[in-house]
């Protein structure tokens, strides 16, 4: 495969990007809200990412998610060695198990196949139950904590925006 996208694609962008092929290094650097699906990335993918969602349907280079403070990445780890290439200082690696995550992942791959005709994406969709356990959810620790506090506020009856505001103050108070 050749590199089809280069340095800094999706840098500070919004919207969606679907790449049938492998991207170069620093794919989705400083992503602050875009959704991207790609079939592999070079070194430093999702570096300094603050928001958005990224799906990687293949290998990553080294130092994935360095400085990532927000957003979520789903990475296919067929060789069970992704942990060696991810920068674990600010993120955790989890299985993709929650129904929201499973639905999001599957829908983004479906959209990727529909828009790009990706054989790789189709292969994964056709055998999704076999591939699902091989995906890792990359989630920043602080972002995960904030999502949990927001959910707690919503359980107390606050609406979305008010729950976010109250969660922010609660987290700041406990620092």
Q: Which residues make up each language-model segment?
A:
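Single conserved hydrophobic/aromatic residue that forms the stacking wall/gate
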Residues: 1-11
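Short, glycine-/Ser/Thr-/acidic-enriched flexible segments
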Residues: 22-25, 41-43, 61-62, 79-81, ...
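Intrinsically disordered, low-complexity terminal regions
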Residues: 57-58, 65, 69-175
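Detector for repetitive beta-architecture
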Residues: 9, 14-16, 33-35, 46, ...
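Alpha-helical scaffold domains
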Residues: 12, 31, 105-108
């Amino acid at each position: 495969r050749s590199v089809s996208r280069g340095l800094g694609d999706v840098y500070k962008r919004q919207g969606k990007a679907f790449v049938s092929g492998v991207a170069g290094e620093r794919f989705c650097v400083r992503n602050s809200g875009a959704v991207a699906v790609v079939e592999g990335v070079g070194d430093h993918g999702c570096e300094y990412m603050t928001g958005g969602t990224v799906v990687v349907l293949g290998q990553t280079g080294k130092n994935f998610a360095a400085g990532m403070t927000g957003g979520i990445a789903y990475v296919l780890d067929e060789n069970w060695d992704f942990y060696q290439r991810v920068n674990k200082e600010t993120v955790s690696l989890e299985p993709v198990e929650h129904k929201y995550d499973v639905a999001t992942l599957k829908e983004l791959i479906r959209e990727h196949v529909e828009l790009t005709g990706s054989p790789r994406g189709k292969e994964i969709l056709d055998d999704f139950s076999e591939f699902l356990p091989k995906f890792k959810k990359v989630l920043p620790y602080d972002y995960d904590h904030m999502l949990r506090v927001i959910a707690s506020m919503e359980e107390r009856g606050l609406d979305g925006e008010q729950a976010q505001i109250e969660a922010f103050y609660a987290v700041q108070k406990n620092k």
